[in-house]
Amino acid sequence: MTVLEDIVAGVREDLATREAATPLAVVKEQALARAGAKSAVDVLRREDAIAVIAEVKRSSPSKGALADIADPAGLAADYEAGGASVVSVLTEQRRFGGSLADLDAVRAAVDVPVLRKDFVVSPYQVWEARAHGADLVLLIVAALEQTVLTSLVERVHSLGMTALVEAHDVGEAHRAIDAGARVLGINARNLHTLEVDRATFAEVVGVVPDGVVKVAESGVRGPHDVLEYARAGADAVLVGESLVTQGNPRGAVADLVAAGAHPALRAVRH
């Protein structure tokens, strides 16, 4: 069993428990009672700068425990104050230490769009994301059959949210586009080895249509990586580990945002 398969198996078990406790009909009522989702495409595709998606992330399969985040709302507020365009919240519990309670806390704390980052395999989780205030939902191509991926993209968009569809290679990028992705995440982390190769972004981005927002995921350790991804064609970067493992997340986000707005990138962006 691969790392991804193991994670998804656990996700399905936890999902079954939640479905038994809260039927889909109830979750749908909660979702439809929410105010409309915030638009994410425009904040991720800016003419003047690279957008930063800052992540609330306690642990990961590759590194184990990263940070003891006692106050996810406070961390998210720091991210927003530092200039983050979107806040990402891990809600997978077993490997990443996240929860829907974290999503609730972050949603209440910030005005920027919020991404639910999880291993979504069922429409229930999409409705659940909206019920808890998410504006974007991560969908991982490698975890989904094409018909399921397409159906989930359509469901996310039908609820006014934005699907961030994640690919790891050219083939997955084509699948994401065929499924209707408007925002494509290109993850530099190999799902089998968990190693990061930032060259993956440059290899994949060439097949992505101009109208699709391109998000570079994994491997952002500092401002120089933002510049590298921007020069390769990224519209946004998603950053987690490097923000939660040092003492000044607000300042760290501000540094990444400043790099994304560097004058040297203007010629690249136009």
Curated annotation (Swiss-Prot):
EC number: 4.1.1.48
Catalytic reaction(s) noted: 1-(2-carboxyphenylamino)-1-deoxy-D-ribulose 5-phosphate + H(+) = (1S,2R)-1-C-(indol-3-yl)glycerol 3-phosphate + CO2 + H2O
CDD domains (alphabetical): IGPS
InterPro entries linked to this entry: Aldolase_TIM (IPR013785), Indole-3-glycerol_P_synth (IPR045186), Indole-3-glycerol_P_synth_dom (IPR013798), Indole-3-GlycerolPSynthase_CS (IPR001468), RibuloseP-bd_barrel (IPR011060)
Entry's transmembrane regions: none
GO MF annotations, alphabetized: indole-3-glycerol-phosphate synthase activity; phosphoribosylanthranilate isomerase activity
Keywords noted in UniProt: Amino-acid biosynthesis, Aromatic amino acid biosynthesis, Decarboxylase, Lyase, Tryptophan biosynthesis
Annotated metabolic or biological route of this protein: Amino-acid biosynthesis; L-tryptophan biosynthesis; L-tryptophan from chorismate: step 4/5
UniProt-listed SUPFAM superfamilies: Ribulose-phoshate binding barrel (SSF51366)
GO biological process, one term: L-tryptophan biosynthetic process
Pfam families: IGPS (PF00218)
Record-stated family: Belongs to the TrpC family.
Xref: HAMAP family: IGPS_B (MF_00134_B)
Protein name: Indole-3-glycerol phosphate synthase
Species this chain originates from: Beutenbergia cavernae (strain ATCC BAA-8 / DSM 12333 / CCUG 43141 / JCM 11478 / NBRC 16432 / NCIMB 13614 / HKI 0122)
